[in-house]
From Swiss-Prot:
SUPFAM superfamilies: TPR-like. Residues 614-686 are annotated as: Type E motif. Pfam families: PPR, PPR_1, PPR_2. Keywords: Repeat. InterPro entries: Pentatricopeptide_rpt, PPR_At4g14850-like_plant, TPR-like_helical_dom_sf. This is Pentatricopeptide repeat-containing protein At4g08210.
Length: 686
């Protein structure tokens, strides 16, 4: 009978290991039939089998039906719940055992409970367990003490972890690696390296911990340790190589990436989804999309069950702004048997954002809802960004409020959308909420809030945001420095803007254009041209907006000759084709000077059809210079081109009244009444 029990127990354990579910059930049925199901030894093995099957409810049922239990019974259940990702259940069962006083915990139980405490962050219980370990003289157990160190590490309690580590007389490689991993996860790489050098015999796990830690920090030292690891004669495995490829992605190190690609092939990892994804990411981030696509297409058939590889290729297309290819790939994923995960859906939403396509976005949004990812940490934030980006601020705001975890991505997307759509008050409110929550406003959020200050000419708020920039070290960042200059310029404090601009370490065409436009807006046209020439002298090419800033400055200051010269320079020296706005500045100046023939010639030479603004500008000048003949021509152009625009009739009425052309004025007012336009200068007070 004893032999039979051992054979039955061995059979149950084997079924659990090889996942032979039906055979295991059959053996359990035999156990019940033989009337030995209440045998503690057999019942424990039945529980162990169900734990291996990850059928914890069945295991718990057997547990509850037992008339007698021992410490193995309790430990198997607690370990099972912990391993199955249900640490709260494990802790609950441990407390139940203590309350029942059926059994005293042993080192295996303590180890399982400490692991559960680490997962849920129950440090208080963990400390009580640690005290019990001390009272029972179990601190000499390396495996158990490793569990203590691991619990502290998982919860970022590195001082306590280090203290517990020092109590281990002969630390194992697991002891060292657990503590090194803790420092790496906390970003304390100098401490991790120091500990690594103290370790008697670092193994593959030790090296991988350091390499992974440097990758997480975006540090090129990851590659330094990868090379050192290989020189030490250790094998670069399926963890180290993808980490190395990721490090190459950060630095755009294509040559090194190709060398690691060879290592992947030599190591036989070319069919590993993890390695393939890393290769695709590396080539995509290094701007070699053709190589990335080659890797993807070569391995697609072998790994078509791994959505991670498809996600990497989708991300690669998006990084390189190949939106059409990304959309095509998304369609392929949809038509395959692959299930969309949060990364796939995030990629799909980014395509919609890039296309600014609300219709497509709503379709993807429906797919997100069906897939159950609407309130996902990543997907939810990008959904907010999508709706905000297309101007659908109301829906974006509703989605934002429904998110259980509002991260910086969600705030950033909504604030940017609000600024873009002119919801300045909401943008300010969101910014204040972000600060209250203790979230770290990045330079892009700050630059958007500065745009709000510029739009509202809110100097007080602008100065407060400037203070925040100094505190966070953003003042020297190009994106925030440019926004600060723009804010001071638009708030009328151009001298402060100039000081900031002159102190910028990096100045691109956008920042130069901003200060040039600012000088023009503040009537300092000479300085606008002086800074323009400074920009040219250091080799920065002006763009169309730069020239528009100069021409606007000339228009405001009545500098016709300078405007003529600037327009010609723009075309002949820089090959830039002017927009209507550029021509408008010169036409307006010619009109102000009464040079109507030259203005008309310029309009006729324009490669663009003149718009209402240009004709209206010339119309106003005709009134000033009493040019009734040209007014008739312009009136014909305006009425033919913009017959339904009430402002056209208002402008014509003003011109006719100025010139005393009463018959024409009467006709225009009659036409305006038919259109439903309100006559200029007329109001009724009831």
């Amino acid at each position: 009978m004893v032999m039979d029990l051992k054979l039955i127990a061995a059979g149950l354990r084997h079924c659990g290991k090889v996942q032979a579910f039906k055979r295991g059930e059959s053996i359990q049925a035999h156990v019940i039939k033989q009337g030995i199901s209440q045998n503690v030894f057999i019942a424990n093995n039945v529980i162990s089998m169900y734990v291996d099957f990850r059928l914890l409810s069945d295991a718990h049922k057997v547990f509850d039906e037992m008339s007698e239990r021992n410490i193995v019974t309790w430990t198997t259940m607690v370990s099972g719940y912990t391993s199955d990702g249900k640490p709260n259940k494990a802790i609950e069962l441990y407390r139940r055992m203590l309350d029942s006083e059926e059994e005293a915990a042993n080192e295996f139980m303590y180890s399982a409970v400490l692991k559960a405490c680490g997962l849920v962050g129950d440090i208080q219980l963990g400390i009580l367990v640690y005290e019990r370990i001390g009272k029972e003289n179990l601190r000499g157990d390396v495996v158990l003490m490793n569990s203590v160190v691991d619990m502290y590490v998982k919860n970022g309690r590195l001082i306590e972890a280090n203290s517990s580590f020092k109590e281990i007389l002969r630390p194992s490689s697991t002891s060292w690696n657990t503590l090194i991993s803790g420092y790496c996860k906390a970003g304390l790489m100098d401490e991790a390296v120091t500990l690594f050098h103290r370790m008697p015999q670092p193994n593959v796990v030790s090296w991988n911990c350091l390499i992974s830690g440097f990758v997480d920090k975006g540090s090129p030292r990851a590659l330094e340790f990868l090379v050192r690891m290989q020189r030490e004669g250790l094998v670069l495995d399926g963890f180290a190589l993808p980490c190395g490829l990721k490090a190459c992605s950060f630095g755009g190190l294509l040559t090194m990436g190709k060398q690691l690609h060879c290592c992947v092939v030599k190591s036989g990892l070319e069919s590993s989804p993890f390695a393939i994804s890393a290769l695709i990411d590396m080539y995509s981030n290094c701007g070699s999309l053709i190589y990335a696509a080659d890797v993807f297409h070569q391995e697609k058939l072998a790994v078509n069950s791994s959505v991670a590889v498809w996600n990497s290729m989708l991300s690669g297309f998006l990084i390189n702004e190949e939106n059409e290819a990304a959309l095509w790939l998304l369609l392929q994923i949809y038509q395959s048997d692959l299930c969309f995960d949060s990364y796939t859906l995030s990629g799909a939403l980014k395509i919609c954002i890039n296309y600014v396509n609300l219709r497509l976005g709503l379709q993807v949004h429906s797919l997100v809802v069906v897939s159950g990812y609407e309130l996902d940490y990543i997907v939810g934030s990008i959904l907010v960004d999508l709706h905000a980006n297309v101007g659908n601020i109301q829906d974006a705001h509703k989605l934002f409020h429904r998110l259980p975890n509002k991260d910086i991505i969600a705030f950033s997307g909504l604030i940017r959308g609000c600024v873009k759509s002119g919801f300045n008050s909401l943008a300010f409110y969101l910014f204040r909420e972000l600060i209250k929550l203790g979230l770290d406003a990045d330079q892009f959020i700050v630059s958007n809030i500065l745009k709000v200050c510029s739009s509202l000419a809110s100097l007080g708020w602008g100065k407060q945001i400037h203070g925040l920039c100094i505190k966070k070290g953003y003042e020297s960042e190009p994106v925030t420095a440019t926004a600060l200059v723009d804010m001071y310029v638009k708030c009328g404090e151009i001298d402060n803007g100039v000081v900031l601009f002159d102190g910028m370490l990096e100045r691109d065409v956008v920042s130069w254009t901003g200060i040039i436009v600012g000088f023009g807006q503040n009537g300092r046209v000479e300085e606008a041209f002086r800074y323009f020439h400074k920009m040219i002298n250091i080799g920065i090419e002006p763009n169309k907006v730069t020239f528009l800033g100069l021409l606007s400055a000339c228009r405001h200051s009545g500098l016709l000759e300078e405007a003529r010269s600037t327009l010609e320079t723009m075309k002949s020296e820089y090959g830039l084709e002017p927009y209507l706005e550029h021509y408008y500045c010169v036409v307006d100046l010619l009109g102000q000077a009464g040079l109507f023939q030259e203005a008309n010639e310029l309009i006729n030479k324009m490669p663009l059809e003149p718009d209402k603004t240009i004709w209206t500008s010339l119309l106003t000048a005709c009134g000033t210079h009493k040019n009734a003949g040209l007014v008739t021509v312009i009136a014909e152009k305006l009425l033919k081109g913009f017959p339904d625009d009430p402002s056209v009739y208002t402008s014509l009425s003003n011109a006719y009244a100025t010139l005393g052309m009463w018959d024409q004025l009467s006709k225009v007012r009659e036409a305006a009444k038919k259109l439903g336009a309100k006559e200029s200068g007329m109001s009724w007070i009831i």
